[in-house]
Amino acid sequence: MTKNIHDVAYELQKTIAENEDFQTLKASYAAVQGDAESKNLFEEFRAMQLGLQQKMMQGQEITEEDNQKAQEVVARIQQDAKITKLMETEQRLNIVITDVNKIIMKPLEELYSAQQA
């Protein structure tokens, strides 16, 4: 009997939500949100990150001023233990998700590599 791919995806979603790294990420995010200074700095970082991404997507040049501001924000971020923990935890979870994505994409990879042989 063939499994419904959407059911499997929902099961994966549930498994990720129950994952220890995700639970740590939730707790770290709550800690940042619960500290006004950390929350404001994190929001500033996210806005800066989004602005730079939009510039790049629109083909606009990232100026020296943009780079300088980004470096200043990152330096302040690195001084905030709550945000640093949040980002480290997010990075660990991203590695897990990247690994899962490689597993999911393996049939396509095998298909296309077999076509080239």
Curated annotation (Swiss-Prot):
The similarity annotation says: Belongs to the UPF0342 family.
Origin, by domain of life?
Bacteria
Pfam families for the chain = Com_YlbF
Protein's UniProt name:
UPF0342 protein BcerKBAB4_0767
Q: What is the lineage of its organism?
A: Bacteria, Bacillati, Bacillota, Bacilli, Bacillales
Q: Which HAMAP family match?
A: UPF0342
Which InterPro entries does its entry note?
Com_YlbF, YheA/YmcA-like_dom_sf
Species the sequence originates in: Bacillus mycoides (strain KBAB4)
